[in-house]
């Protein structure tokens, strides 16, 4: 496969890295801040002791998010995909997973952050895997060329997610599919706090955000250790659903993200909390918002998933 034919700009390839002679749009201030945040976050995750637990969880969750019963079903699905793009690949572990499942395919992992350099080094032995540092809203990839485009847990962090969705869906081939995930809007008290941090993060140094993230991890841990369940009333005006809750999950979903998973350990949980509060770009969606974006780009829903955290699915032209 001649990779040069995929791009509207001239490219150069050095080992497993793609470079473009680019005239890309300058990043907005918020996108520059978000880029820096994720460069720092992925560096911390790479140095963490329990990233394999994170990777394992993310792969299993990926199957649920995009309608695959198991890894074999995903492998079969990928078997006729010549070109796969993982837009917003971070450290590249999912790109590498897909490349191993589909050894006859070309997989291109794209990310705006410096994580691309780490990914390139970590997976240089996979011959069908390439990495490309770029804004995923401005990839310079030609339209109608990619058999499977993935934007998993990333599109909300771009300057204009609706524009990014349009750009990524446009590069999907006529027989291809686009897999995308968006944050789901939460209860009103949590939304108000989250909106505050989208602006406040400009004025809070990253070291203070890491400190706060560690404190939120500790809060989540202590709340979980209480092991208290209670019955909450339904409060529809605030968007709070009634039902039986663990106290940590009730606060988490409705008031304050204080992530904690014992099997991930403190470092990965700190990074997860940092991931939420540090980026200035982090849009959330209602179901109708997400569906509108899909249909406005003339895409058909093949698979749709919803849970408290998100909406996701696979779509085709």
Model regions and ranges:
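Conserved class I S-adenosyl-L-methionine
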Residues: 177-227, 246-249
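Glycine-rich phosphate/pyrophosphate-binding loop
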Residues: 232-268, 279
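Residues lining the SAM
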Residues: 152-155, 181
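Active-site micro-motifs of SAM-dependent methyltransferase domains
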Residues: 138, 156, 185
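Conserved N-terminal segment of class I S-adenosyl-L-methionine
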Residues: 1-144, 148, 152, 281-283, ...
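A structural helix-start
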Residues: 116, 158-162
């Amino acid at each position: 496969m001649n990779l040069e034919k995929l791009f509207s700009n001239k490219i150069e390839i050095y080992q497993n890295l793609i470079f473009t002679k680019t005239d890309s749009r300058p990043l907005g201030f918020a996108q520059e801040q978000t880029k820096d945040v994720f460069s720092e976050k992925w560096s911390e995750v790479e140095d963490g002791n329990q990233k394999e637990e994170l990777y394992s969880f993310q792969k299993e969750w990926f199957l649920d998010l995009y309608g695959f019963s198991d890894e074999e079903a995903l492998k079969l699905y990928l078997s006729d995909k010549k070109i796969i793009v993982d837009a917003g690949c971070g450290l590249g572990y999912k790109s590498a997973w897909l490349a191993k499942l589909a050894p006859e395919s070309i997989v291109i992992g794209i990310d705006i952050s410096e994580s691309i350099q780490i990914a390139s080094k970590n997976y240089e032995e996979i011959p069908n895997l390439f990495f490309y540092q770029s804004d995923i809203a401005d990839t310079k990839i030609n339209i109608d060329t990619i058999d499977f485009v993935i934007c998993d847990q990333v599109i909300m962090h771009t300057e204009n997610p609706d524009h990014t969705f349009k750009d990524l869906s446009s590069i999907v081939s006529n027989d291809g599919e686009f897999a995308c995930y968006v944050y789901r809007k939460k209860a009103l008290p949590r939304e108000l706090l989250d909106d505050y941090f989208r602006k406040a993060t400009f004025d809070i140094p990253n070291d203070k955000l890491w400190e706060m993230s560690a404190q939120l991890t500790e809060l989540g841990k202590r709340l979980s250790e209480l092991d208290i369940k209670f019955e909450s009333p339904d409060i529809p005006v605030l968007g709070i659903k009634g039902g039986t809750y663990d106290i940590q999950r009730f606060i988490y979903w409705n008031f304050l993200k204080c992530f904690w998973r014992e099997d991930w350990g403190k470092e990965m949980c700190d990074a997860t909390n940092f991931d939420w509060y540090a980026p200035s770009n982090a849009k959330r969606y209602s179901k109708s918002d997400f569906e509108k974006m899909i249909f406005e780009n003339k895409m058909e829903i093949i698979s749709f998933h919803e849970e408290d955290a998100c909406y996701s699915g696979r779509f085709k032209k």
